[in-house]
């Protein structure tokens, strides 16, 4: 059984594909075959090995796609990381509370990173782009889950945020912890 830890949490404004960490988390779509936003950037910068690994996963285990809230690891290709952990965030719905699925993305990514022996992990703000999740709520769920669910050997968690608005929202949540 893994031991819970209080990770060092860092906020970084920039491009997640520039991070030097053990695990980069990809906010993937269920096809695992690349898309827009973070997903597209990771596939473009990481090169064809990531897509090849994702195609193999689709053929062997995820024929219908990776379910929302789950996570799976592949090579990091040309990125300065050991692995990419792909997770599928929920599309925001004002009519249905899907926050448990969003928390599951962070929890399952952390669990998988720990199983892989990772000490550092970089997350984007999952579901806050095209999937429409409000940034303030997405930041609260992300930070709360990371603080509660990080286990050894993970020591450092980075939230890599593309714009100033996201950075400020995460900064405010971290200041209240």
Curated annotation (Swiss-Prot):
It comes from the Bacteria. Pfam families: Macro. InterPro entries: Macro_dom, Macro_dom-like. Residues 1-177 form the Macro domain. PROSITE patterns: MACRO. Belongs to the MacroD-type family. NCBIfam families: PRK00431.1-6 (NF001664). This is Macro domain-containing protein in non 5'region.
